[in-house]
């Protein structure tokens, strides 16, 4: 037992380290702090809970057991997690008429039988150790001057803040001016969508979520003149590695593919008076989408 003489507060909170072979077991002698468990304790108890299912055990212990930023584990089995969730839900329930009790909520969610929360709620509800989102995924964007550099950076900031809180993010890039269109700065023309795909992708890779990168979905309308560049962006090795990409296809485009006739792309994509218009071979672009999806599983 090691105890610092200039920290008398530790008299009530002594961490005893008991070495048992390779495993170190922390036995907290505090009557105030929450109880902690070793990884081995949690793994073995959870394996018994899941009746020997090693995959379920590993996933729950690594992703959903309550932990703090130091890696200390505060839940021994999913029963502890369900009790935490039930306690917090009951606290909110008490603010409304005819509330469910903690035990009633617990019976609904225990053993993953009737209600199975999403991953983020399982981690975040009642969690006093981490700032975590209570939703798995978010779709973001903004109205108005969204294609300005300030608007593009604002979306980037929103993406990062959501990913810091364990949220997956999706946003559409159809509001960004196509490559070659005029802009009011020294560059004179827009760089198009591809560089901003890389920006958002890099932001995703920079934000670690407990050792794993965040999840990002980028999409574009087939009406956008940069749709082909968007579709090809991930074909170059090492590009846009932090995002998945999807194309929003409309009936008009598919009919043009069937009829083997040209298709008009424009920007803004819904404008009656577009500032940029481009005519393409619909069938050729469709074949490229199919080829890229076959080769790299994207675009979706």
Where are these regions (language model features)?
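Extended catalytic cores of very large enzyme megasubunits
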Residues: 1-300
